[in-house]
Amino acid sequence: MAYSMSDLKKGLKVEIEGVPYKIVEYQHVKPGKGAAFVRVKMKSFFDGRVLEKTFHAGDKCEEPNLQEKNMQYLYHDGDHFQFMDVESYEQIALSDEQVGDVAKWMTDGMTVSILFHNNKAISVDVPQVVELKITETPPNFKGDTSSGSKKPATLETGAVIQIPYHVLEGDVVRVNTELGEYIEKVK
């Protein structure tokens, strides 16, 4: 299916010259003279670069052949991350580059969403909120409890976040994976 200028909106996935993009910014412009046009910023699913493009009336772009699958993260063998399709039990291996920054939030057995373009894995998404155990954080000292103060903490996955002083080593915390921020301590 082809999208016309009027179909474009933020969050829409489009394909231009064989590359799938997600529209991250959308602006409809009506100049005083001439025809209206749409200016968009699109992020590539392949390499993450952002492309700015202007669409005029009559311009078309294609809908990409994208398929999203829920897969279970099994383990990391040093070179690749191993995933299993939860429906067909088929396993795939993705390189560190294919998985990207979300690797720091993944734990064994976690269900992740993998996006495929023409049956090739192009991105991995983890849930927006995950629960992880704190494996290392400095001890608290008297007087450390001033409001708004935070300290660094290393999570079970190796990621480092800032946490409040009342949270201790061994505690489980909820983390926003998009922002990389502490949300709350799990009771």
Curated annotation (Swiss-Prot):
Pathway: Protein biosynthesis; polypeptide chain elongation. Gene3D superfamilies: 2.30.30.30, Nucleic acid-binding proteins. Coiled coil: none annotated. InterPro entries: Elong-fact-P_C, NA-bd_OB-fold, Rib_uL2_dom2, Transl_elong_fac_P/YeiP, Transl_elong_KOW-like, Transl_elong_P/YeiP_cen, Transl_elongation_fac_P, Translation_prot_SH3-like_sf. It comes from the Bacteria. Its main location: cytoplasm. GO terms for molecular function: translation elongation factor activity. Keywords: Cytoplasm, Elongation factor, Protein biosynthesis. GO terms for biological process: peptide biosynthetic process. SMART domains: EFP, Elong-fact-P_C. The keyword Flavoprotein does not apply. It is found in: Cytoplasm. GO terms for cellular component: cytoplasm. Pfam families: EFP (PF01132), EFP_N (PF08207), Elong-fact-P_C (PF09285). Belongs to the elongation factor P family. Involved in peptide bond synthesis. Stimulates efficient translation and peptide-bond synthesis on native or reconstituted 70S ribosomes in vitro. Probably functions indirectly by altering the affinity of the ribosome for aminoacyl-tRNA, thus increasing their reactivity as acceptors for peptidyl transferase. This is Elongation factor P. It comes from Wolinella succinogenes (strain ATCC 29543 / DSM 1740 / CCUG 13145 / JCM 31913 / LMG 7466 / NCTC 11488 / FDC 602W) (Vibrio succinogenes). The gene is efp.
